[in-house]
């Protein structure tokens, strides 16, 4: 199954509160919204991708519990980006002082903040171009570091704020650099 994009703009402009309500009233459907206001219905992942997402998230949570530098999120969290888009990265992380600057209401709904770090793990049905466009959208919204992991091609694209995309072929690990100090993601099991 692939993602489906629906454009309601000629009929009605969906407000932030309406989009939030749409998501709340349809908890079994994962929605995103691009900067043009189009609604994207995201398909569920298969078992393998879901397992790898879970394992990767666990690595981030363990690191973050040890360092207490920020807040980790999984793909069920939708962020309101500065461009107006609503996106749900597979893994994301926000530095603690930035998260603490949000109001309780902002934290409760779709936080109006771009994460410092995002990770997208492609599933077999994901479009590479659409996922690359999403990664570029994150960078355009001031995300500092992003990893696009493509298990099919055994390739990782590293996105850094203000820099060219770096492409790695079958890396065994990724460093969180200065954004995620001391974090290293082991990728050996991902390529098996």
Q: Where do the language-model regions lie?
A:
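Gly/Pro/Ser/Thr-rich low-complexity, intrinsically disordered segments predominantly at protein N-termini
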Residues: 1-192
